[in-house]
Amino acid sequence: CQCRRQRQMCIRDSSKGDVSTAELRLDMQKAMQKHAAVFRNTEILDEGVKKLGDIAMDMNNVRIQDKSLIWNTELIETLELDNLMGQALVTIRSASERKESRGAHAHEDYPERDDKDWMKHTVMWLDEKNKSKLGYRDVTLSTLTNEVQSIAPVARVY
């Protein structure tokens, strides 16, 4: 909780840049729409990782004019954007690393599902500077109790 509060105060107190929250949010939205839509390819994803990284760096140059702590919608929107930016970075970086198509992730360069290499959860950590560390976690295919049977995974067919 203390780390979160420190992050919030840091954003509020050091936001003397020249880029508005609205500008950054719109740039992030456009980048995600263009580079992380449902149908993706390696080139688009790689461009998107770079583009979104550049946009995320602009969070260091965000401007918050209202420094109050009461009814400060500008601060709230910036804190929301900070959270959304982290989610966007994780989403696009995870998608660029996954060399298969699965569920809502359709990779045009890898149209098949690959359970042998990709039956795993992608886990990512972001540091204070939005640098990411990628990891993986096994998928649990069994149920917690014997009350219900486990269902084997199958490819989605539309």
Task: Label every model-predicted segment.
Residues 6, 37, 150-153:
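Glycine-centered secondary-structure boundary/capping sites
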Residues 1-11:
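Single conserved hydrophobic/aromatic residue that forms the stacking wall/gate
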Residues 13-88, 92-95, 100-102:
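C-terminal non-catalytic alpha-helical accessory regions
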Residues 61-158:
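C-terminal amphipathic alpha-helical interaction region
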